[in-house]
C-alpha cells in the first residue's frame, strides 16, 4: 500500500504555493518524518482527515519558506530587540485567547496576526493589508472555513487579521503540541517529550524579530505549550 503522503510531496506542494525552494537547515526533517509516520500508524484518518493533515503540514513548510526568504531579504532583523515580552499561557479552553486578544488590543503591544504567523514577513502598515495578495489568500481561506464550519466561530473565531497563538511559529520546526491536539498521535507525542526545544524557540525568536522589524512595541504572545516548555521559551 502506498503511503498517505511523503515528505517529498509536501515539500513540492509548499514550493508550488509560495514560489520558494529554500527550506533552510534540515533541523526539522526528523520531526516531519515522525509526524508522517504517526499520522499513518496512529491517527486512523478519514479521507477528509488526510486532506486536512496534508494541508497543515504543507502550511508549516510554506511558513518555513517565507521565514527563510524574509531573513535573507532583511538581515537587519537580527538586531531587533524583543523587550519585556508578555507570554499568556494556561490550559486549553480556559480563556487564554480572550486575555491574549485583550492585551494585544493595547496600542503599546503587538500580537501575532494569523496571516503573519502563516507567512512571516515584516509587518506592513495595516492600511495596506487588504491589498496584500498573501493576506487576501489567507482571509479567503478563513471565510471558506466560516461557511463550512459555522459552529467553530463560537469556539475560536479566526480571521487573517485576528491575533493568534504563536505555536504556529513552532510548527516550522515540526515540534509543537498543536499536532497532537488535533489528531491521535501517541508515537509522535512520545517522541516530542524527548526533544530539546532550544532550536525550535530560537527559530521562534527569529520569526518574532522579522515580523517586528521597524516597531518598538512590546510583544504579546499566547500558547498553552509555553507552560510545558518554559525554560526553552526563556
What is the meaning of each model-derived region?
Residues 1-73:
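Long, basic/Gly/Ser/Thr-rich N-terminal segments
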Residues 3, 46, 50, 92, ...:
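Aromatic-acidic/polar surface patches that form glycan- and anion
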Residues 76-83:
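Phosphate-binding P-loop
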Residues 87, 98, 207-210, 233-234:
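Short, hydrophobic/aromatic alpha-helical segments in well-folded domains
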Residues 87-107:
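Glycine-rich phosphate-binding P-loop
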Residues 105-115:
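Post-Walker A helix-loop "phosphate-sensing" segment adjacent to the P-loop in P-loop NTPases
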Residues 118-222:
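PAPS-dependent sulfation machinery
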Residues 218-234:
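Long, well-ordered mid-to-C-terminal structural blocks that present hydrophobic/aromatic surfaces
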Amino acid at each position: 500500500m502506498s503511503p498517505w503522503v511523503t515528505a517529498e510531496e509536501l515539500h513540492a506542494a509548499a514550493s508550488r504555493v509560495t514560489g520558494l525552494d529554500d527550506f533552510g537547515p534540515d533541523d526539522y526533517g526528523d520531526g516531519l518524518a515522525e509526524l508522517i509516520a504517526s499520522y499513518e500508524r496512529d491517527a486512523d484518518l478519514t479521507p477528509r482527515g488526510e486532506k486536512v493533515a496534508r494541508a497543515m503540514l504543507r502550511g508549516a513548510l510554506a511558513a518555513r519558506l517565507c521565514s527563510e526568504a524574509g531573513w535573507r531579504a532583511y538581515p537587519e532583523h537580527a538586531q531587533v530587540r524583543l523587550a519585556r515580552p508578555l507570554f499568556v499561557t494556561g490550559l486549553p479552553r480556559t480563556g487564554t485567547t480572550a486575555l491574549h486578544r485583550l492585551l494585544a488590543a493595547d496600542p503599546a503591544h503587538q500580537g501575532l496576526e494569523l496571516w503573519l504567523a502563516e507567512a512571516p514577513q515584516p509587518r506592513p502598515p495595516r492600511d495596506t493589508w487588504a491589498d496584500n495578495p498573501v493576506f487576501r489568500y489567507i482571509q479567503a481561506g478563513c471565510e471558506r472555513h466560516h461557511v463550512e464550519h459555522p459552529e467553530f466561530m463560537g469556539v475560536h473565531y479566526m480571521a487573517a487579521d485576528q491575533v493568534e497563538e504563536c505555536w504556529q511559529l513552532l510548527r516550522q520546526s515540526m515540534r509543537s503540541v498543536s499536532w497532537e491536539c488535533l489528531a491521535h498521535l501517541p508515537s509522535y507525542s512520545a517522541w516530542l517529550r524527548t526533544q530539546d526545544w532550544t532550536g525550535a524557540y530560537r527559530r521562534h525568536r527569529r520569526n518574532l524579530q522579522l515580523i517586528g522589524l521597524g516597531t518598538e512595541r512590546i510583544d504579546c504572545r499566547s500558547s498553552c505549550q509555553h507552560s510545558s516548555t518554559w525554560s526553552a521559551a526563556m
